[in-house]
Swiss-Prot record:
Binds 2 Zn(2+) ions per subunit. Probably involved in some intermediate steps for the synthesis of the antibiotic polyketide bacillaene which is involved in secondary metabolism. This is Probable polyketide biosynthesis zinc-dependent hydrolase PksB. The keyword Hydrolase applies. It comes from Bacillus subtilis (strain 168).
């Protein structure tokens, strides 16, 4: 299959935080979307410049600060549109320049490249994944090695279970996963790999999932690399 886009992972750091954001470049138009821009603005702008790509949009998986803190400078520099789920916007009263709310199953596009928006609550009330033809950008819903915590306002381990089951049922095994954080594995592993190495993909009963996700004294939950 000839892809219409390229994925450019960017690892960013600030103090104790390590995040992954992603530039998706439409090959023909050289237009770009950035997913969850965080911490190091120069890495994003330098990558765009090297690609000779024009930033058209920012796609946000959720509203936590470590995933949205570069929205303001990027919208000022590029006048880019900003996408976030309507549920997330309404629940947390998120506001920014050029904000566009998205519904479940809605489609966004740049050039010849399209993505389906999947509502995946659990880590937050209105988390959203962006499913391209061969790639899914999952924020803090699914990591290669785990899933997001479900302890903050709007979180729900029950909804996290449902969201992971949805990904398992609706996303093809060959699709590559690009999460917001990593515990050591590089982004871009397939859904099939997660079935083998991610315990949250292996638990099929909601009761067991919730007990395991909410267990006490979990260690290393923010040990991102």
């Amino acid at each position: 299959m000839n892809l219409t886009y390229k994925v450019h992972p960017i690892k960013t750091r600030y103090q104790g935080w390590t995040n992954y954001c992603y530039i998706i470049e439409d090959i023909v138009s050289r237009s770009a979307i950035v997913v969850d821009p965080s911490w190091e603005l120069s890495k994003i702008t330098t990558t765009l410049s090297e690609l000779e790509a024009e930033l058209k949009a920012v796609a946000l998986t959720h509203s936590h600060y470590d995933h949205v803190n570069l929205v303001d400078p990027l919208t000022k520099m590029f006048n880019a549109q900003v996408y976030m789920s309507k549920k997330e916007i309404d629940y947390y009263q998120f506001r920014c320049r050029n904000l566009i709310s998205l519904d479940d199953h809605q489609t966004i596009s740049i050039g010849n490249t399209r993505a389906q928006c999947l509502l995946t609550p659990g880590h937050t009330a209105g988390g959203m994944c962006y499913l391209f033809s061969e790639s899914i950008f999952t924020g803090d819903t699914v990591f290669t090695e785990g899933c997001g915590i479900c302890e903050d306002d709007g979180s729900s381990a029950e909804e996290m279970f449902d969201s992971i089951q949805r990904i398992k049922s609706e996303v093809s095994p060959h699709v590559r996963v690009y999460p917001g954080h990593s515990f050591g594995k590089s982004p871009g592993h397939s859904i099939k790999d997660l079935y083998q190495h991610n315990i949250y993909f292996q638990i099929d009963k909601k009761e067991y999932f919730v007990k395991f996700r909410t267990r006490k004294n979990q260690k290393g939950i923010f040990d991102f690399k």
